[in-house]
Amino acid sequence: MVYHHHNHESRIIHCRKQLTSWRRRSLLLTIIVVTATVVSLISQEAEAHNQNAPPILYVRERNWRISETEKVGQIIDRVRAEDPDGDDLIFGIEPRFSLPGGENDASPPEKIPFQIDRETGVVTLNESLAGRAGQNFLIYITVTDGSYTAKNEVFINILGERENSSGYRPQTSISNVVHNISQFLPRFDQLPGVQSIRNGLPNSRPGGWYPPVPQNNIFGPPPFGNNYPPPPPNIPGVRGEQSGEEEQPDEEVTPTTPVRISSTTPKSRTKLTPITANNSTRVESAIPAETTTPSGGHHNNSSSPITIFSLKSGTIPIVVTVGGFFVAIAVLLAYLCRRRLCAISRTLKKTKEKEELAKKSNQSQLSSTLTDDSRNSMVMQQWQGPVAFANRYVPWERDQQMGIATSQLSTGVTNGGVSSPGVPSPGTGEPGSNLGPGCLTGGAGSSGAPENAFAGEANCDRWEFPRYRLKFFNILGEGAFGQVWRCEATNINGNEGITTVAVKTLKESATEVDRKDLLSELEVMKSLEPHINVVHLLGCCTDKDPTFVILEYVNRGKLQTYLRSSRAERHYGNTHGKSNVLTSCDLTSFMYQVAKGMDYLTSRGIIHRDLAARNILITDDHTCKVADFGFARDVITSKIYERKSEGKLPIRWMATESLYDNIFSVKSDIWSFGILMWEIVTLGSTPYPGISAADVMRKVRDGYRLEKPEHCRRELYNIMYYCWSHDPQERPLFAEIIQMLDKLLHTEMDYIELERFPDHNYYNIVSLSGEKL
């Protein structure tokens, strides 16, 4: 009994599975059948409504009256055609067989004496018409696009020689008559696939071209003065002229539309037949077909029913059905995957909110740092540069440093919690503490030697500052291998809160030599005590690449740029904020302050080697600070440094012994200071204007010196000239220069007459020879 019950339950479960499987298969089969049905309906509808439009044929004259004396090769007419689909068109000529019945029917000639160019549509005479005067016959001018053929009837009337003077010959070239312009530039109504009807076409035809047509539509003999055989009756496309009455349609029933032609040409019919179909097949048109009456001339008012195919009536239901089918499928899929879609939307929303908060915080911090003077000042234009992305330091080699950080962390855990190398320890990071963040500590078992000797020495000094406290903004300036960024440092140099600083670093393209130069500059600045005329070092980051040298931020920037920008303000003035117009006393004070700063560096045994206006920074209160110690060397022992490396050189600022003997000393800095004085007097002009670097070296060696500017007095120029003595021992010291400039400052004389400054004599040149400007 138990076995029977168990067997029964298993059968029920098996039946349920089969039923579920059958339902799934039925649903899938239904979807496939519906899709196939929709596709077949669309394909059938597309085949039923072939969008290929027939060509449109234009024949200027439907009645060619040609003299039998015409020469072979004469152009009879020019036929035009166009195709809305842009298909290639082929022209042709066919004989027109008249309707049966009637003795006066025009019979086609044995051979059509015309030929047409298949591409251009030019109809020419290909055989002589001599002896064929009086013949009348009909031909078809055809054009095909490969799918449909359009035909226009043309009535041919061959005239005798004596009738040539009084007869009419249709024009074969472009006429100057105004009314013939409409033959070439017709206006079209928007009717799909057929020829359009010209608005205002007269219902009556002017007399004189065709013989009068009697009431029974039988043509009589033409009024030519001779008894030629009459034209055929019931000519399709030719309607008799009925005065005061409407035109009577012909007996032939053809779905055609009249061609819009000149008012002087008769109306005709265009017969459209597919090439592959029988010529008797009716071509359904989008316009009602014309109906005819019997030859009795009575007009039939009742029109026969005609099926009008509409593209909208067939395609709209199909499109709606298919669209509804796909919408239903989309709704079903969205319902089934609603949980995943909601999770994706929540993730995107959170990401967008985080980005907006980050942007708002960055904008608020930037706006709180920049003052109105820094925004509006014309001098601050040189500070504009690319903005850092996300205000976050990103190391160059992430993968390598991730491995280093992992090894350092594991080492710290092994040593019982002692700080590992390179990992910031809790602290202020201020220069006043001997063990700040980033300092190397650890016991005997600690591993992780510094990458280089310079970094090893710097990691345990008071200048190390944690990188995460730096927030980068924009580039203040850059050279071939270095960059200076404007940053914000938190709690640096004993100052609580945020301090704006300048961070000097190297580009990724820098070489090992450039890296050593930056570390050498850092060592030079570490040996200096704070001085008002020397840029102050605030800290550094040397625990790993890239090395950061943190300097005080001088908001006015380079003295060279400041002097050049003062030229425009001297002429046009400053309408915003504090005026920057410089005076003779200001310029002399700049020289005095630079001399004070260089005297301090000299007393500490420092040779600058690149003293120029571009390496002097200036503050809002016109305080000058010597900066850029990239070439500086500590030569306190020998007093002389001999250059061994190659690179860009400030040729126009270098002394003769530096140019030719590679010898640098305090006296070579004195020479450069004289050039700096000339720069200040000329408001930032390039020394030796108009002379190449090679000529400068040769002329300076031969005794040539910078000439005295016109607006500079002799007393000030003499100080410059003393600095350019060929013998270094004859040049003054910085202490002596300070005394001479101090005397000039205490007099009321303007030694720089800026009102006489010749703007046209001094200009700035670009570096073309690899020199440093």
From Swiss-Prot:
Polar residues bias spans: 254-283, 290-302, 361-373
Enzyme type, top EC level: transferase
Biased segments, Acidic residues type: 243-253
UniProt xrefs under InterPro entries: Cadherin-like_dom, Cadherin-like_sf, Kinase-like_dom_sf, Prot_kinase_dom, Protein_kinase_ATP_BS, RTK, Ser-Thr/Tyr_kinase_cat_dom, Tyr_kinase_AS
Biased composition (Pro residues): 209-235
Domain (Protein kinase): residue spans on this chain: 470-749
Residue numbers on the Cytoplasmic membrane side: 337-773
Record Pfam families: PK_Tyr_Ser-Thr
Keywords assigned: ATP-binding, Glycoprotein, Kinase, Membrane, Nucleotide-binding, Receptor, Signal, Transferase, Transmembrane, Transmembrane helix, Tyrosine-protein kinase
Statement: the UniProt record of this protein carries the keyword Cell wall biogenesis/degradation: no
Binding residues for ATP: 476-484, 504
Intracellular or extracellular location(s): Membrane
SUPFAM superfamilies: Cadherin-like, Protein kinase-like (PK-like)
Family to which this protein belongs: Belongs to the protein kinase superfamily. Tyr protein kinase family. Fibroblast growth factor receptor subfamily.
Protein name listed in UniProt: Tyrosine kinase receptor Cad96Ca
Record organism: Drosophila melanogaster (Fruit fly)
